[in-house]
Structures are given as structure tokens and as C-alpha cells.
């Protein structure tokens, strides 16, 4: 679609000649997400329908205890340092963004009074600013008022390079100004049609200025409130034992009437996914269990217990293997996996190509994940029409052997291939979880047949996904040759998801390993495409840019990742629990509206 055709369609919607729904459906056919199409309509001033939630309770409280199981336990409760989903989910119990993404990919206001549109004056005609009106009467859990000063402070906090915030990429290229006590303006340096990033969803949780102002920059990790959150959410802090448990109680001053339904909340961490599933589906000890990364055959057997159900929600999450582009075994200036090094084996495209052929994705789907994981060749998988059609996966040990042989990697007396004094011996790490260990074993067995020796390393999940910068075994540090985990797609637009392979997001000592690119992949074409996509209005051109980015990182020539299975979000819940879950936000995004049918 050409730009003039797109503008013509937008004009027809504005003039009432084409319905909003018809426009969005047409954009979906072109491979655009519904939220992106919706933002286009907002940009030209077409009114949106408000998100409707089915919440039945007519008073606050009275629901007793809400019991949650996160088998990867939260270790920190500051959203700006939450590298792992578990810490983001834990933080979201207490902290809120200006807006979030509902299950259909629509924006809904949380701490904002309304979603900015052209119609209400929130979106500038030139596309270079967004004005947010804040909800009034909101209080922090300590009784202090929530104001524009808090919003501006969060931008200052996250954009300060010395803070090394996880979401610095969201905030460093914008400016935020206070208009009045309950209005802020986000300024872009160029027209930005897809503006819904800063202060939204996972990256948008807002911390209180009055408790963090003395802990900006290099002192940010010292703030006592990192472990004792004071937010605006429906539940307020009672106790936190990192790696074990969170306890909270209903916020009597919550800014939404009749919420929350539950009087108390306990999030129990640790254990494993199977025991978490059993505690909800079979014994009924808990109401909700997160991330059912369990063999599907086991889930079906546990569901027969009758206490709960497994729910699968569409999203964009991907289980994948990363190949380290740097040398994890050489230290430079006090840093392993330094950008000043190259991986001794994976710098050879032939070795990377061979590893791609040695991952039996279809077997992983068929024998491990079932309905909760679909074999894929793509990093970017959702929406379906957004997937690259240029890629395919293949499991072929003989072909891998042939590639290595032709590239000069010869088998030694021990059966391990080597070249120039470098042996194909790799450490392959992931978190402790039965499906992941089975996946590792499948890869190890195939690699052995190709003359590659793989040492399997399994790290406790709460350690592997820890936000503790002193921990050497976290996935952002990537002190191994290969690693596997699931990365979550936390918004329906692909921009934030695809920035994980931008060169400026490389995880390094300088940014306290908070960069979103642990593989340290650096590619000039990728960077240029990403920058161009940020200002591209034509949905077809923009989709093509993301598809090309996907093809670069998974491709034979320069690729450094091996997608394994696309993972819709699967969770277990009590049959009486009513919980809104979005594939585009944290599991705890709408916890204020959770309730039980009696």
C-alpha cells in the first residue's frame, strides 16, 4: 500500500465513509497489528471505543486471600531494574503505568485520565508530541499525592545512563515536560506515528519521586524502596522475601471504586512448573499459577483433577537459543563476554549454520510443548501475517557435518571437531525446568553426532533471571557459549521487541548488564532498519522492515539466534477465579479486577 492510499483510507474513516472496524480489518490483512492500526486512527482524530471489563463485585474487599504461584520467584521490586518477567510481574502488583494494553491490544488508561487522541488534543498534528492528562486524587501507598512531578522524574531516572535502567531505550530519545500538576507532555525529535511506548505497560510503571529522588544515577541500586515498594496499585506492600514470597493487602485508598475484590495477596515463589500446576489444577491449594512451561501431556493429566483449568492466551513470546558473539572465557578490562572480543567458533558462519541444523524443533513441539509451543523459524511470530515467509527450519545432522567439514573443522582423535587450535566445545546454559532440560538433551545428542561437544549448564530460575547485577549466572551476562530462554513480547507493536538486537542495547559492564541484547549482536543494516522503522508511516513498508530484521538475526549468513518454539501464554487458574490476562502485558496487569465467582 502506498502512503497516499493509506491517507485516503484514514480520510474516509474520519469522514464517516469507512467504519473504524473496517479500517482495522483492512490493516490486519496487510500484516499490521490491531493496536498499530488503532493508533493511526487516533493520530487523525477518529474517536475510539473505551475498553470494557467484565467486573461484577459491587464493593471493595470481602474476597479473602488471593494465592498466586510464580515458580520463578521475584528477587527485586523496582520495575526499572526488572530484567526478568518474574520481577516485572511482582512490581506490577504495586506499581502502575499511565496506560496498559488489554487482551485485544487496545490502550486503556490506568494513571492517565484518558488515552491521548487528536480529538482530545493529546496527539499533536505534527506527530512530535503526546500530551497526557493524569488522573487526579491518586495517592501513593504512603498517602502522598501522585502528580506530574512523579512522571517527569521517572523519565529523568530511566534516561540517566548512570541508573542503567532496563527500559532506558524507551526514555533516552524522548523529552518529558510538566505542563501543570496533572499534565505532562512527551516530546519526540521527529514525527512518531507509533508513540505508545513511554509510560505504557511493562516499561511504563511509575515509581514515587519523593522516595527515589535521592537515589538517582549511580546510587539507584541503594534505594531501600527497591525491596519495599510504595506504589499506587490496588495492593500495598506488607512483606517481601526475595526469591521466596510477596505479601500484600488491599489498598483502602485505591483510585478505582469497588477494587480490589481480594483482601490480601500472597505470591509464593520457587519450586518448579509441574508442582505449581499441580497446586492449582489438582489440589486447589492456590488460585493461579504463572507460566505453565510443562509438558502438555502432564498438564492434561493434572487438569483431570477438576480443581482448575489451563488457559492459553495469544501473544508474541518465543523460546529460543542465543549464540554468543563475544568470548565468554576471555576477560578484558574486568569484563567477560566483552564487546572487544569475538567468539572463537561462532564468529565462523559455518559453525552457526551447523548449530541451526542441529536443533530438532518439531520434536520439541511434538514431544514436549504441544499446545503451549509451536515450532518456528522466526523470532517475530505474531500477528500471523507479520511473520516472515522467507524462513524455514530444518533438522539435518548429515548436512551439519558436511558444512563443518567443508569449512575446515576436522574431527580429532576424541571425535570433537577443531580448527586452528579451537575446539567445538560449548557450554549451553538455561534455567532449571524439565522441558528446557529435555530440549538441551535433544540438542546435545544431535551435536555429538556432528562432532560438537556440549556441556549442559542448568541454573536455578530465580538466579538465571535475577536482576542482581552482582550475580554471574544471569542471562544478561551470558557467561556461556549458548543459552536458551523465553523472551516476552510486552506490547503488540514490534518495535520494543525487535530492539533486542540493536547494537546500542548490548548488555555490558558499562550499563550494568541492563541492555536488552545479551548476545551482543551488532549489525549495521539491522540498526539502520530499526531507526527507519521508528518514523515509517506506511504499514506495509514498516512491516517489511521488521520482517527483514527478523530474517537477519535468524538467517544463515549473519544470524545468531535459533528460534525453537513460539509460546502463547499458558497459565493455570482455579475454576472460580476470573482473571483478565493479556498477551501484551504482564500477567498481573489487571490484578485489581480479579475476583471469584461464588
Locations of regions flagged by a protein language model:
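Extracytoplasmic/periplasmic ligand-capture domains
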Residues: 2-18, 22, 26, 50-61, ...
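N-terminal export signals
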Residues: 22-47
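General beta-strand recognition
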Residues: 67, 108, 131, 183-185, ...
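Protein kinase glycine-rich loop
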Residues: 70-119
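Short aromatic-enriched loop/helix-cap "lid" or pocket-rim segments at secondary-structure transitions
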Residues: 80-82, 198-200, 379-380, 469, ...
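Surface-exposed binding/hinge segments that line
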Residues: 166-216, 239
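Active-site-proximal polar cores
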Residues: 564
Amino acid at each position: 500500500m502506498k502512503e497516499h492510499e493509506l491517507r485516503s483510507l484514514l480520510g474516509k474513516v474520519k469522514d464517516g465513509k469507512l467504519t473504524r472496524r473496517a479500517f482495522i480489518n483492512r490493516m490486519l490483512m496487510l500484516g499490521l497489528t490491531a493496536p498499530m492500526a488503532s493508533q493511526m486512527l487516533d493520530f487523525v482524530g477518529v474517536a475510539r471505543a473505551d475498553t470494557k471489563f467484565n467486573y461484577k463485585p459491587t464493593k471493595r474487599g470481602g474476597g479473602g486471600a488471593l494465592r498466586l504461584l510464580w515458580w520463578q520467584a521475584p528477587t527485586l521490586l523496582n520495575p526499572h531494574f526488572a530484567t526478568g518477567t518474574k520481577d516485572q510481574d511482582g512490581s506490577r502488583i504495586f506499581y502502575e503505568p499511565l496506560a496498559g494494553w488489554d487482551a485485544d491490544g487496545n490502550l486503556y488508561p490506568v494513571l492517565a485520565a484518558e488515552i491521548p487522541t487528536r480529538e482530545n488534543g493529546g496527539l499533536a498534528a505534527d506527530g512530535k508530541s503526546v500530551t497526557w492528562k493524569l488522573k487526579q486524587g491518586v495517592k501513593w501507598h504512603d498517602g502522598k499525592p501522585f502528580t506530574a512531578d512523579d512522571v517527569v522524574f521517572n523519565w529523568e531516572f530511566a534516561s540517566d545512563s548512570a541508573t542503567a535502567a532496563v527500559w532506558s531505550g524507551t526514555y533516552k530519545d524522548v523529552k518529558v515536560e510538566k505542563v501543570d500538576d496533572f499534565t505532562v507532555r512527551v516530546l519526540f525529535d521527529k514525527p512518531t506515528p507509533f508513540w505508545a511506548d513511554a509510560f505504557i505497560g511493562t516499561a511504563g510503571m511509575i515509581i514515587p519521586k519523593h522516595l527515589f529522588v535521592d537515589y538517582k544515577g549511580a546510587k539507584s541500586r541503594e534505594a531501600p524502596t527497591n525491596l519495599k515498594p510504595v506504589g499506587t496499585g490496588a495492593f500495598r506492600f506488607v512483606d517481601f522475601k526475595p526469591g521466596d514470597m510477596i505479601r500484600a493487602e488491599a489498598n483502602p485508598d485505591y483510585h478505582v471504586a469497588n477494587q480490589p475484590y481480594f483482601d490480601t495477596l500472597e505470591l509464593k515463589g520457587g519450586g518448579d512448573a509441574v508442582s505449581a500446576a499441580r497446586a492449582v489444577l489438582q489440589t486447589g491449594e492456590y488460585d493461579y499459577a504463572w507460566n505453565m512451561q510443562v509438558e502438555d501431556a502432564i498438564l492434561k493429566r493434572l487438569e483431570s483433577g477438576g480443581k482448575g483449568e489451563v488457559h492459553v492466551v495469544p501473544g508474541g513470546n518465543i523460546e529460543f537459543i542465543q549464540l554468543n558473539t563475544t568470548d565468554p572465557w576471555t576477560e578484558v578490562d574486568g569484563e567477560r563476554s566483552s564487546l572487544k572480543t569475538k567468539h572463537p567458533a561462532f564468529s565462523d558462519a559455518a559453525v552457526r549454520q551447523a548449530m541451526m541444523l542441529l536443533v530438532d524443533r518439531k520434536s520439541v513441539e511434538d514431544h514436549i510443548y504441544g499446545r503451549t509451543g509451536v515450532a518456528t523459524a522466526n523470532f517475530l511470530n505474531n500477528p500471523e501475517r507479520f511473520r516472515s515467509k522467507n524462513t524455514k527450519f530444518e533438522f539435518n545432522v548429515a548436512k551439519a557435518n558436511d558444512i563443518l567439514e567443508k569449512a575446515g573443522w576436522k574431527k580429532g582423535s576424541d571425535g570433537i571437531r577443531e580448527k586452528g587450535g579451537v575446539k567445538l566445545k560449548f557450554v549451553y546454559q538455561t534455567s532449571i525446568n524439565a522441558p528446557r532440560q529435555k530440549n538441551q538433551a535433544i540438542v546435545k545428542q544431535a551435536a555429538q553426532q556432528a562432532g560438537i561437544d556440549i556441556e549442559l549448564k542448568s541454573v536455578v530460575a530465580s538466579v538465571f533471571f535475577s536482576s542482581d547485577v552482582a550475580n554471574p549466572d544471569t542471562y544478561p551476562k551470558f557467561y556461556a557459549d549458548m543459552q536458551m530462554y523465553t523472551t516476552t513480547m510486552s506490547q503488540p507493536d514490534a518495535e520494543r521487541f525487535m530492539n533486542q538486537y540493536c547494537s546500542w542495547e548490548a548488555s555490558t559492564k558499562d550499563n550494568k548488564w541492563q541492555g536488552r541484547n545479551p548476545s551482543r549482536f551488532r549489525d549495521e543494516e539491522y540498526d539502520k532498519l530499526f531507526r527507519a522503522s521508528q518514523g515509517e508511516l506506511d504499514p506495509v513498508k514498516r512491516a517489511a522492515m521488521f520482517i527483514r530484521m527478523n530474517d537477519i538475526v535468524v538467517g544463515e549468513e549473519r544470524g545468531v539466534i535459533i528460534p525453537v518454539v513460539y509460546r502463547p501464554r499458558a497459565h493455570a487458574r482455579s475454576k472460580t477465579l476470573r482473571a483478565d490476562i493479556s498477551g501484551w502485558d504482564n500477567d498481573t496487569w489487571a490484578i485489581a479486577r480479579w475476583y471469584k465467582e461464588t
